């Protein structure tokens, strides 16, 4: 009897704090995934780093042996200055790009990477005035960019996601959940093809030193706003039509980022993912229900859209289809 009471009380305790348990598992899972990534990256990249260090030591020792008039401190001072300039996007190599890093098209490309928080790090402000302006420009520009992307994604999602799903649901009677899943998968496949595979093939042709994997890697790193900066297009030696190429890359990054956000928003609107996300949210109390606090669904990535406007939009979209079905039903009844 006591054991059954204890068991039932434990079950009630777990159910009462189910959201907290799920959140704790979520935090633990994220930390484990972080450690897993660190272990894999370290085991894969550390041997290559060690080989590169050994190769550089051999080259340095051989160079000093062949040029006895040059001391090691002088060589290190020269190399340090060269590396410092390279960090600012300036190279001393004769076959390096002779183009300026701060002409208009390059500055436009830099501004787009700053506002999208991609930040390759290949070109950075050199002067104190440029660094100060970059801070002010980013403080204003990044929220402005988020507002712009929110408005664009909301409008595109209405026409690309909600209307097609609602049409197949009302016109053909398919389950809204099933149509949403199929539509999200198809949209994701089209987006990956148009903004990853095809551009990767184009970059592998335009960039002499890039293969398809490196080009695909650049597309993913850029559109996911990681922006490591190890691959930057348009920086090759004697790049043809460099200005036009830079403008095209800027447009590609902006359109690709919008497409990625539309796909993410489409997946976040799936009923199954909404239920899954609610497992980790704090349940609202009755007092919270009485005041108009933002619902938990809006705390997810899908909060970038105005959900109240979305509901109204869906209602407006459903009216023509419902009216058409009612009129068709009335005509069939009159004919019989």
From Swiss-Prot:
Membrane topology listed for this record: Multi-pass membrane protein
Subunit structure of this chain's protein: Homodimer; disulfide-linked. Heterodimer with KCNK2; disulfide-linked. In astrocytes, forms mostly heterodimeric potassium channels with KCNK2, with only a minor proportion of functional channels containing homodimeric KCNK1. Interacts with KCNK3 and KCNK9, forming functional heterodimeric channels. Interacts with GNG4. Identified in a complex with PSD and ARF6; interacts only with PSD that is bound to ARF6. Interacts with UBE2I.
Residue positions the entry lists as glycosylated: 95
Molecular function in Gene Ontology: identical protein binding; ligand-gated channel activity; outward rectifier potassium channel activity; potassium channel activity; potassium ion leak channel activity; protein heterodimerization activity; sodium channel activity
Reactions listed under catalytic activity: K(+)(in) = K(+)(out); NH4(+)(in) = NH4(+)(out); Na(+)(in) = Na(+)(out); Rb(+)(in) = Rb(+)(out)
Location in chain, cross-link Glycyl lysine isopeptide (Lys-Gly) (interchain with G-Cter in SUMO): 274
Site feature: Important for increased permeability to Na(+) when K(+) levels are subphysiological: 118
Cytoplasmic side: 1-20, 157-181, 268-336
UniProt-annotated stretches for the region Important for intracellular retention in recycling endosomes: 293-299
Task of the protein: Ion channel that contributes to passive transmembrane potassium transport and to the regulation of the resting membrane potential in brain astrocytes, but also in kidney and in other tissues. Forms dimeric channels through which potassium ions pass in accordance with their electrochemical gradient. The channel is selective for K(+) ions at physiological potassium concentrations and at neutral pH, but becomes permeable to Na(+) at subphysiological K(+) levels and upon acidification of the extracellular medium.
Family: Belongs to the two pore domain potassium channel (TC 1.A.1.8) family.
Record InterPro entries: 2pore_dom_K_chnl, 2pore_dom_K_chnl_TASK, 2pore_dom_K_chnl_TWIK, 2pore_dom_K_chnl_TWIK1, K_chnl_dom
Keyword match Disulfide bond: yes
Site features described as Part of a hydrophobic barrier that is stochastically dewetted and limits ion permeability, chain residue numbers: 146, 261
Swiss-Prot/TrEMBL keywords: Cell membrane, Cell projection, Cytoplasmic vesicle, Disulfide bond, Endosome, Glycoprotein, Ion channel, Ion transport, Isopeptide bond, Membrane, Potassium, Potassium channel, Potassium transport, Synapse, Transmembrane, Transmembrane helix, Transport, Ubl conjugation
Extracellular side: 42-103, 123-132, 203-211, 232-243
Selectivity filter 1, as annotated region: 117-122
Region (Selectivity filter 2): 225-230
GO biological process: chloride transmembrane transport; glutamate secretion; potassium ion transmembrane transport; regulation of resting membrane potential; sodium ion transmembrane transport; stabilization of membrane potential
Pfam families (UniProt xref): Ion_trans_2
Subcellular location: Cell membrane; Recycling endosome; Synaptic cell membrane; Cytoplasmic vesicle
GO cellular component: apical plasma membrane; dendrite; membrane; perikaryon; plasma membrane; potassium channel complex; recycling endosome; synaptic membrane
Intramembrane region list: 104-116, 117-122, 212-224, 225-231
UniProt modification remark: Sumoylation is controversial. Sumoylated by UBE2I. Not sumoylated when expressed in xenopus oocytes or mammalian cells. Sumoylation inactivates the channel, but does not interfere with expression at the cell membrane. Sumoylation of a single subunit is sufficient to silence the dimeric channel. Sumoylation of KCNK1 is sufficient to silence heterodimeric channels formed by KCNK1 and KCNK3 or KCNK9. Desumoylated by SENP1; this activates the channel. Desumoylated by SENP1; this strongly increases halothane-mediated activation of heterodimeric channels formed with KCNK9.
Protein name: Potassium channel subfamily K member 1
């Amino acid at each position: 009897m006591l054991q059954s009471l204890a068991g039932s009380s434990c079950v009630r305790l777990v159910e009462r704090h189910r959201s907290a348990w799920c959140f704790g598992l979520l935090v633990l899972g994220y930390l484990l995934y972080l450690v897993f990534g660190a272990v894999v990256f370290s085991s894969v990249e550390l041997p290559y780093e060690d080989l590169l260090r050994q190769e550089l030591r051999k080259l340095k020792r051989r160079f000093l042996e062949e040029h006895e008039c040059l001391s090691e401190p002088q060589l290190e001072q020269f190399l340090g200055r060269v590396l410092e300039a390279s960090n600012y996007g300036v190279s001393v190599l004769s076959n390096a790009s002779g183009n300026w890093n701060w002409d208009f098209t390059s500055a436009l490309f830099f501004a787009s990477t700053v506002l999208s928080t991609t930040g390759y790090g290949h070109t950075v402000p050199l002067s104190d005035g440029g660094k100060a302006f970059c801070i002010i420009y980013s403080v204003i520009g990044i929220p402005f960019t988020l507002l712009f992307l929110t408005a664009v994604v909301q409008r595109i999602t209405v026409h690309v996601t909600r209307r097609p799903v609602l049409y197949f649901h009302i016109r053909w009677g398919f389950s809204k959940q099933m149509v949403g899943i199929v539509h999200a998968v198809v949209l994701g496949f089209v987006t990956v093809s148009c903004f990853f595979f095809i551009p990767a093939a184009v970059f592998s042709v335009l960039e002499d030193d890039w293969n398809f994997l490196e080009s695909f890697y650049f597309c993913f790193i850029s559109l996911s706003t990681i922006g490591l900066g190890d691959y930057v297009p348009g920086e090759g030696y004697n790049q043809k039509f460099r200005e036009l190429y830079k403008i095209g890359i800027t447009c590609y990054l902006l359109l690709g980022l919008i497409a990625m956000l539309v796909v993410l928003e489409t997946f976040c609107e799936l009923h199954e993912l909404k239920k899954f996300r609610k497992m980790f949210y704090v349940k609202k109390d009755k007092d919270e229900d009485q005041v108009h606090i933002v619902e938990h669904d809006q705390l997810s990535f899908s909060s970038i859209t105005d959900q109240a406007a979305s509901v109204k939009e869906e209602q407006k979209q459903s009216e023509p289809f419902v009216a058409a079905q009612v009129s068709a039903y009335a005509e069939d009844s009159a004919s019989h």
